[in-house]
Design a protein with these regions (language model features):
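Electropositive polyanion-binding surfaces
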Residues: 4-445, 461-499
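Short alpha-helix capping/helix-loop boundary micro-motifs
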Residues: 398, 449-455
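Extended, highly charged clamp/arch subdomains and adjacent linkers
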Residues: 1
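Surface-exposed acidic, glycine-flexible loop patches that form ligand/cofactor-binding
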Residues: 458
Length: 499
């Protein structure tokens, strides 16, 4: 439970709960336009809304309206300092630790339906090839016409079923899907990497009891919003870079060549056919490796190997490009409710004229931004770890209630003492070598595999196992399994390693 200071609480209750006429002065009125939000069914903090039209010249006009949080959270105010402390919202299984007070996140800054909200609108004209031909942004006021859900939109996109209340929006949604696919195709042509969806989802009942565990579904609606947010962040980053003033970029640098080659060599030694890496600087090369593996059932294991060869993304005032997205410049501005640097970018855009004409000192601004970038990057990793550790506790609870269940699993990593394994449901655990029920296996440190000297059968990363619960330790968030080698896997591995 987050404890707020008196100053923070006072600021929360001093904020308006609705948009006033005074607030709307100087803003573009988009309240009559078909603008909607598309989020998860339980989302309360909605900070992005989308609208679309098609121009007579055949180009698409995409409007992405983002909650104007900086209008309410003044720079250096108590709530701003709180945001700098938290830096991000942390989404646990059954709760949210908000970056901002929930009365703000879910109230005046949330783009709730049928009420006016203050926004920054990013207007992007995109041609049928997916190229950005025009970009502008402006302060606006919107009135979202509907709170849509991914699930409902996917019914339209995947099953041609229109849920109640969606009838007036079908044409717009289909046009959005058309544009999203065009953007997706351009991203692939540029070399953008798709490591697949390896995010776990826990299905809970009303009491918080785990009913099931599965891969988080990423259907057409989820991809639509992802593509729209990516193209918005791309357009803004390119615009600001060309403008030449201080800004915050989301960098993902080129991977170290030796790391990439080491991982590809390991994957090749496991029997998979992968072309040798000549130039890892080009994302098309890594894209080709991914495409040669993504049809495999165990791809979620192989992709985690490839991900380890990548550098970590981070925030910086220096533009280094985004390797994974295959973009020359990238930013993150589409979630100012839940990410500090998105909020910081709003402050920059609010004061762009003062920065440009020198009223705001560029060197002082850069120093301040560098410190915020460093903290946000660090805290992002902490938040990811917190979510991961919370997930492991839920994994333990799920398995403890299914102790007699046999899980299909794969080897994710092999150490000198044990194997790290992951089930199809993305539940992680370990198997000590003594807990392999199919004979004695010896570790080969050079090849990083296990081999049974009697049968010559090898266990390597990606090998399939039958997993049975052995024990759990909640304090250390550890699941231990016994393992049984899948008969078919044994035959396949022998075939692979004979060549």
């Amino acid at each position: 439970m987050v404890r707020y200071s008196k100053e923070e609480i006072d600021q929360v209750y001093s904020l308006p709960t609705e948009v006033t006429d005074e607030d709307k002065k100087g803003r573009v009125d988009l309240t009559d336009e078909n603008i909607v939000t598309i989020d998860g069914a339980h989302t309360k903090d909605m900070d992005d809304a989308v609208g679309i039209t098609k121009k007579p010249n055949g180009n698409y006009l995409l409007k992405v309206s983002i909650s104007h949080v900086s209008r309410y959270i003044k720079y250096n105010s108590p709530l701003f300092m709180r945001a700098c402390h938290n830096t991000t919202s942390v989404y646990l299984i059954d709760s949210v630790n908000h970056m901002l007070h929930p009365q703000i996140s879910n109230g005046i800054c949330s783009l709730n339906p049928n009420v006016e909200r203050l926004t920054k609108t990013y207007q992007i004209e995109i041609n049928p090839k997916g190229e950005i031909v025009d970009f502008t942004f402006f302060d606006s006021v919107i009135k979202s016409k509907k709170k849509m859900t991914y699930e409902d939109c996917n019914e339209i996109f995947e099953n041609n079923v229109v849920p109640d209340g969606y009838e007036p929006f079908v044409n717009d949604l289909l046009l959005m899907q058309e544009l999203a696919q065009i953007i997706e195709n351009r991203r692939k042509e540029n070399g953008a990497l798709d490591f697949g969806n390896s995010e776990i989802e826990f299905i809970l009942d009303d009491d918080g009891t785990i009913l099931d565990v599965t891969h988080r579904h990423q259907g057409p609606a989820e991809k639509l919003i992802e593509n729209f947010m990516v193209v918005t962040n791309e357009a803004l980053a390119e615009y600001m870079y060309n403008l030449g003033i201080e800004f915050v970029y989301r960098n993902h640098e080129i991977p170290y060549d030796d790391k990439v080659k080491e991982v590809v060599k390991l994957i090749t030694s496991m029997g998979y056919r992968v072309d040798a890496i000549e130039n890892s600087d080009d994302p098309h090369v890594m894209q080709a490796v991914i495409n040669s593996l993504n049809s495999k059932e165990e791809f979620f294991i192989l992709s985690s190997l490839l991900l380890r060869s990548m550098q970590k993304a981070y925030f910086s005032t220096e533009n280094k490009g985004h390797y994974g997205l295959a973009l020359n410049a990238y930013s993150q501005t589409t979630s100012p409710i839940r990410r500090l640097m998105d909020l910081i970018i709003e402050y920059i855009l609010d004061n762009i004229d003062k920065i440009y004409d020198g009223t705001i000192d560029m060197e002082k601004l850069k120093t301040s931004l560098n410190g915020l970038c460093e903290r946000a990057s660090m805290m992002e990793r902490c938040a990811d770890k917190a979510e991961y550790e919370a997930n492991k506790l839920y994994m333990i609870d799920y398995v403890l209630k299914r102790q007699d269940t046999e899980f299909d699993g794969y080897i994710q990593e092999i150490t000198p003492r044990y194997m790290v394994v992951k089930t199809k449901e993305l539940i992680e655990g370990i198997v000590y070598f003594d807990d392999i029920l199919d004979g004695n296996y010896a570790y080969n440190p050079d090849c990083k595999w296990l081999e049974n000297p009697s049968t010559r059968h090898r266990l390597m990363i990606g090998s399939k196992l039958k997993l049975h619960f052995k024990e759990a330790n909640r304090e250390y968030r550890l699941l231990k399994f016994n393992a049984e080698v899948n008969t078919l896997e044994r035959e396949m591995t022998l075939t692979r390693t004979k060549n």
